[in-house]
Amino acid sequence: MATQPPPARPPPPLTSSPYPYAAAPDIIRAHQKDAYFQGVLANRLSDLHRRLRGARSAHAWAAETRTFAAALYLCLTTLLGNRTLGEEYCDLVQVEEAPSKLFASSSSKAADDHIYENGLGGGGDGGPLLPSLPRRAGYILTAIVLPHLASRALPSVRSAIRKRLQSRLATLSRRRQQTGTKSGSGRGGRGGGGGITEYRVLRYLLTHLTPLTSGAHFRAATLAVFYFTGAYYELSKWVWGLRYVFTTRAGRVVDDDHNRHHHSPQHGGGNGGRAGYEVLGVLLVVQMAVRAWLHVREQLSSGSVAGGGGEEEEDGEDGFRERTAFGPGTNVDVSLDEHAFTSNNELLGGGGGGGGSSSQRSLGEIGAMAHTPVLKAGRARYDLGTSDKVMGWIKGAQQRKCTLCLEELKDPAATQCGHVFCWACIGDWVREKPECPLCRREAMVQHILPLRAA
């Protein structure tokens, strides 16, 4: 009788992966490279838009152009299952951080369907799971599309919240006046303690509505967590459980023994024996704590929560902060690449990438420091459309119009090359692209000079 071959035993469970998790420096380097190529693609699309539709249309749709460029870049790479140029540059592959049971269960068909050639290297020894198509599409949606939609809807949401706060404050103010009249005192009487507290809280929310709804503090906290853990560089990657691994096997990296035993995905490591950014995380946390403490101390010492003048200041802050609240931060741009123009978007606002809008000075503070009266939002100090006598030394109807908005100049400002535009128009332009719209000469935000009449 022929002896039957013994039944094939199932492969042993995969207890460790030969592909270590990527270190924080490599993740940041890959992000910088991707940000650079996204900027190049956005510039090409913007130039094409300018040639087809003109400079005014290109300027008006600059934010949409950047969003479309970023989405197109990720759709041509991540959505199709390919690596981005930054990932290829740093030898990284994006994988799912699947539960350990998926690695241990070799009979699971769901796991087998996602394993790429029995492992990332095709060597038959298993490996982490590549992200599925729905997960890749969800990542692009939450990383690019949703932030852009939120930035477009944010001004309307702020306006609605501001109207409700102002209405409630007016009601409380009238109630306090009525109570004070009945009690013979103008301070609101003893029974208005709860109303006074509510009034102060609502006044604080109204005065600081823009920084409270900017999301900059949340982005800074996300970045601080990444500095400590080195896992998720973006919040959207944490939502979809996407991490990076090195395509180079653990035995080929610099500290091979250390990587093999301590830095596999199953052991939760992955820094490859390289130093992380924990020190930066500590500094960022200290910075946020100090700013929070200074803000609380300022509110307690000045009593600005219950003070007046909040409405005028808030009206002026809208025009100043509305552009910087989500504009640059929408992309959660922590890239240090000098070619990523969106990383310089907050220069005029004075806020850093991790600090957020809380570090920006309000228009009231700037006016007090510069001894200059603050105008309400939408108003211009010098509007050449009101009269020909305003800056009459600018001759000619065409010379008195802005090339970007095609309207009469408002608060004219000149670049280093001598071209004159509206202050708001050229400020928005150089935040998106630091060059003159006419001659393409470099024009940084700190070099824009406002013109003043004699």
From Swiss-Prot:
Keyword set includes Metal-binding: yes
Any single GO CC term annotated in Swiss-Prot or TrEMBL for this entry: peroxisomal membrane
Membrane protein topology class: Multi-pass membrane protein
Zinc finger (RING-type) in chain: 402-440
Main enzyme class: transferase
UniProt-annotated stretches for the region Disordered: 171-194, 302-329
Gene3D superfamilies: Zinc/RING finger domain, C3HC4 (zinc finger)
Peroxisomal matrix side: 1-23, 77-132, 230-276
Record comment regarding domains: The three subunits of the retrotranslocation channel (PEX2, PEX10 and PEX12) coassemble in the membrane into a channel with an open 10 Angstrom pore. The RING-type zinc-fingers that catalyze PEX5 receptor ubiquitination are positioned above the pore on the cytosolic side of the complex.
Protein name: Peroxisome assembly protein 10
Lineage: Eukaryota, Fungi, Dikarya, Ascomycota, Pezizomycotina
